[in-house]
Regions:
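Ligand-binding pockets and gating/stacking loops
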Residues: 11, 16-17, 21-328
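Short, exposed "boundary/linker" segments that immediately precede the start
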Residues: 1-9
């Protein structure tokens, strides 16, 4: 499970020019426990900046890309309105799909290996199977009122409750964006805005952790909360020399939260300098974070590879170390 700050992660703002998606790598490595639901689901009330680029699979096969659920709708029928076919029965759909798939396979046989075509063939089958289970999975109204009250009434709380329901049903990777576009990118009025945003998600995060513990899922679920950079410790000054009480981007020192899934609880690892500007003690690179996440999911990050352009690629490229001090 990963919560994002809804900024342009696909633009590689922390300096890497190789844009790869960690969640697609997890799905590639683990597969899916539930063949009726996608292995990677991305929820956002609308779209984050750069839209669908954020859950594409990079150079991995398209079957590992995420499925976007627009959570600005509260009705389950609206949430998954494009999954159900209201004109054809399941039997009629199956006959229609079998014919389309026959044509697709004949087309594929005349071409060299085409990952995009193979992904499309598989996506049609997944869309058909999703009709069996998607309605139940996304319908939080089936939860007792006490559970819904526990999570809270915000959009973010509702997304987190959906995330728990998806995890229960075997979805490997659930990504939860906090707000559409980039609400955390506050170059002005940062204190007021961040307090509001924190209030929208804090109750739901606490409820999710407690709920997973009570259901025996906490130790099997890795929760990662954070973004791709922090904010400067100093107020940002505009070109006109005025302050709007905001902060600029800062990739030199910021924090993330990991919980569950083999993480040692109550641990603080690393520290910034006295100004809160850059990591000064036990700095962690994004490759180290990825290596640690993969380790907690049962992978050796140096051995999980995908061959592309005549090279065996890793999520961590040629870098990365497992941060063993935070592992229980």
């Amino acid at each position: 499970f990963k919560q994002k700050t809804a900024y342009e992660i696909s633009a590689c703002l922390v300096g890497s020019e190789m844009c790869i998606r960690d969640r697609s790598w997890v799905t590639y490595g683990l597969g899916s426990e539930n063949q009726n639901l996608p292995g990677f689901i991305s929820m956002c009330p609308g779209y984050p900046i750069q839209e669908s680029q954020n859950w594409q699979s990079g150079f991995l096969p398209g079957i590992y890309q995420g499925t976007h659920i627009n959570t600005r709708h509260t009705s389950v029928d609206k949430l998954i309105e494009h999954v159900k076919n209201r004109s054809l029965s399941l039997g009629e759909q199956r006959r229609q799909l079998d014919f389309i798939q026959q044509l697709n396979h004949e087309h594929a046989a005349k071409r060299q290996k085409d990952a995009q075509l193979e992904a499309r063939i598989q996506s049609f089958e997944l869309a058909y199977r999703m009709q069996m289970e998607a309605t139940d999975a996304f319908d939080v109204d089936r939860e007792p009122e006490s559970v819904r009250e526990r999570y809270g009434k915000t959009t973010q709380s509702r997304q987190l409750l959906m995330a728990r329901r998806l995890i229960e049903r075997g979805v490997r990777f659930v990504q939860v964006w906090h707000g559409k576009w980039q609400p955390w990118d506050n170059h002005d009025e940062i204190e007021k805005n961040h307090r509001k945003l924190a209030d929208e998600c804090s109750q739901g995060i606490g409820a999710l952790i407690a709920d997973l513990k009570e259901r025996g899922l906490f130790e099997d679920t890795l929760i990662v909360i954070g973004g791709e950079f922090g904010r400067t410790p100093t107020v940002e000054i505009t070109n006109a020399g005025k302050s709007k009480l905001g902060r600029d981007h800062n990739s030199a020192g910021f924090s993330m939260v990991l919980a569950g899934g083999g993480v040692k609880g109550g641990t603080i690892y690393g520290a910034t300098d006295e100004f809160g500007f850059q990591a000064a003690e036990n700095p962690v690179h994004v490759h180290d974070l990825h290596a640690t996440i993969l380790h907690l999911m049962g992978f050796d990050h140096e051995r999980l590879t995908y061959r592309y352009a005549s090279r065996d690629f890793r999520l961590t490229d040629v870098h990365g170390r497992v941060i063993r001090d935070i592992i229980s």
